[in-house]
A protein has these predicted regions:
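Active-site helix of classical SDR
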Residues: 131, 167
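Conserved glycine-rich Rossmann-like NAD(P)H-binding loop of the short-chain dehydrogenase/reductase
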Residues: 42-57
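Substrate-binding pocket helix/loop in short-chain dehydrogenase/reductase
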Residues: 107-108, 115-120
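C-terminal helical subdomain
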Residues: 191, 212-252
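Active-site-adjacent segment of SDR/Rossmann-fold oxidoreductases
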Residues: 156, 177-187
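Residue(s) in the substrate-gating loop at a strand-loop-helix junction
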Residues: 151
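Conserved glycine-rich cofactor-binding loop
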Residues: 28-29
Length: 252
């Protein structure tokens, strides 16, 4: 084999996940997009769940083993049934990445109740609904991997981020409890807690973002996605309950 052939073959993604079926929420941008693409590269069949999955699907090569599902995860009453429909369409589910989320910046004294509820519906209750949808299938096959994308804001409170912090603290508690419940069924439930990540979420916050926030010094979605893939690819007999990933620049 020539050096050129060897180099070319070594650059090809290793298809460790051929035959696996994955669902990724918040998959049209940011962390969700990056991890969904890596799952595809690893050979998995991937369902892209977001309000606008066409944004990313239009970028994929023809014939990609991917399908988009336009779902508003904040409309919590219908989430479980819609995820069950995806599982039926895929013919099963092996991997769930709960990534969709939103933030609110402002003092708690000024936060409207409807904004609080909207944040918790997406950041926490939609995760609960997705879990209820996938767990029966994963239990029946006695294996599965679930990764909940939390935040360092689920470990430390930050001023003006009270609602977001509360939702992520709650998500970590949910993850830990479900991990204990599902371990006897062969299902891994893990969390990843990134520090600041330069995602489109910041664009939705407008002038509420302090000028001191240097987005260029934050983690990239690709870096977080690589860490998530490390969790996905762990040996069957290993689990990382909670992975904290921080920017080397020292930002939260």
């Amino acid at each position: 084999m020539s050096d050129t052939q060897s180099t070319t073959e070594s650059n090809k993604p290793i298809k460790k996940l051929v035959g696996k079926k994955a669902i990724v929420t918040g998959a049209s941008s940011g962390i969700g997009k990056e991890v969904a693409l890596r799952l595809l590269e690893s050979g998995a069949q991937v369902s892209f769940v977001s309000r606008h999955p066409d944004r990313i699907l239009s970028e994929l090569p023809v014939g990609s083993n991917a399908k988009g599902y336009a779902i508003d995860l904040g409309a919590i009453a219908s989430v479980s049934e819609q995820i069950k429909a995806i599982i039926s369409d895929m013919g099963g589910v092996d991997i769930l990445i709960n990534n969709a989320g939103m933030a609110y910046i402002g003092e708690i004294i000024d936060m409207p109740l409807d904004e609080w509820q909207k944040l918790f519906d997406l950041n926490l209750t939609s995760v609960f609904q997705c879990l209820q949808a996938v767990l029966p299938t994963m239990r029946s096959q006695k294996n599965g991997t679930i990764i909940n994308v939390a935040s360092v804001a689920g470990k430390q409170g930050f001023p003006n981020w009270a609602a977001y912090c509360a939702s992520k603290f709650a998500l970590l508690g949910l993850t830990q409890a479900i991990a204990a419940e599902e371990q006897p069924h062969g299902i891994k439930v893990m969390s990843i807690c990134p520090g600041s990540v330069n995602t489109p979420l910041w664009d939705t916050l407008g002038d509420k973002v302090p000028p001191s926030f240097n987005r260029e010094a934050m983690l990239t979605p690709a870096t977080v996605a690589e860490a998530i893939m490390t969790l996905v690819n762990l040996p069957a007999d290993a689990v990382i309950n909670d992975l904290v990933l921080m920017p080397n620049a020292g930002l939260f």
